[in-house]
Amino acid sequence: MRKGLPLLLTLLMTSTAPGLRAESFGHADVDGLTRTVSEIRGQLRDPASRKDDVRALLSGRLAEVRQDGAETPLALDRLATAGKLHTVPIDFMLAQLRLQTARHFNVEIEKALANRAAPALFIRGGSMTLDQLLAEAANSHPGALEQKGEKVVSHWPIVIWSDSALVIAPGQSLELSTEDGAFILNSGLLTVDGGELSASDGTNPGLNAFRPFVATAMTGAVQARRAHFKSLGFGGSGATSGLSVLGAALFPSKIASYLTDSSFENMSGISLENTHRVVVSDNHFSGGTGPAIALKGVTGAQIRDNVITGTTEAQAIDVQNTSSSIDVTGNILIGNRGSGIFVANDARDIAITDNLLSGNGRGGVSVVRSACVTITDNIVLSNSQVGIKLRASHALTLSRNDLVANAGAGVSIVDQDENARVVVDGNVFTGNKSGIHGGAASEVALTANDFSGQSPILLDGEFAPYVPHLLRAAAGSNADSRALTIHANTSSADPVDCKTGS
């Protein structure tokens, strides 16, 4: 039975139970969807493109991806007072970086500083625009900044103190010198409103791997809209990742960080850690090592309507380390080296909804050692490895997803605890290596799934003996008889309660 199914039995796998998507996939449908996704990918090659540029192609099976999320907060916070420019010794700057980023501090950063005798620029007492910063630096600190065409190049590190702000306005461009080891430490407010923030070309002689970065820490916040970030960051996630927001329990930021309608080109990535109320929406991430967006210990973030393509080393979206109440909605994640979305290490209350995940190197979605994750209304198409992989996780619901032509199983469920439970409801399986793979799994409840396009292997691994049960359930006369529970829990332990958090 595992090797193949007669056509009649396969047709039995089309369920008409409520909640199922209205139409099954045929070969022509798969070919059409594949062509459309290829066209979407082609139109998104320009880093300046956005999801809106392909909205006309998001129809039919892709209509759920088309939907807009909640309104983006567009109001930028402003400081009423004018800031002043000072300098601080570089050792103070490094001590602050070490203090404010704690374990995220990279001790090798000191090697990147071309002139250890030079101080760092220090903004405090209010707000400064980039033009004001350039003018004051030219008067009192020659050589710290210079105008090169339309760009302002910083050769010194810049500190934005907790009572201050730096504003990069529309049409303005700040370039941090790679050769000089420049970077920004922000514990105040960094605003990039229609401007550009980038790293210069070249190699740092003291630390070849170094690329300039922006670290926002403790009470700091960063707000960007219609901005362009380019070539920032090195060393994966953390303070040097490119653009980071690193919160602290004793020093919570009173201003929310958000990044919207912006381009991130060849960035190592965005790293959000131990912070809350963050919105990352309507952006385009192209190239870079990845993760494009990494969350660790984050509460209450919205990651929505972003385009992420071509990460070279890691996943597109990475949610880890007790992150909770995270909404990942309406994103287009295509051609990334790792998984499209990776959730791990005690993440909880994660909603993954209305996303398009295609051509990703380590599968569409992976959930590892996490709980209370819902994966709903996603298109998971032609990914290497598995469409959706669940490992050692609790209280998971997969509903109304299209799992199509993935190199591995449409869904893989492995290494579950004895009291874990997975609900697989109303999904469509088409042309995957197998429908659902099981290994050391606990309870899996199957209802109203469509396997009519999934052949020859419906259930794989330790689930293979359940194929006859699945066929009988599919032929049932009512919704209750069409349900199938594999490995029903017999443990006396209470299941995870997603409402109470226990």
What residue spans do the PLM features occupy?
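Sec-dependent signal peptide recognition
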Residues: 2-8
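Bacterial N-terminal signal peptides
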Residues: 8-15
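Conserved, well-structured beta-alpha core segment at the onset of a catalytic domain
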Residues: 20-28, 443, 458
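Beta-strand/loop edge motif enriched in small/polar residues
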Residues: 22-329, 333-342, 348, 357, ...
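Eukaryotic tandem repeat interaction scaffolds
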Residues: 324-435
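Leucine-rich solenoid repeat scaffolds
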Residues: 429-498
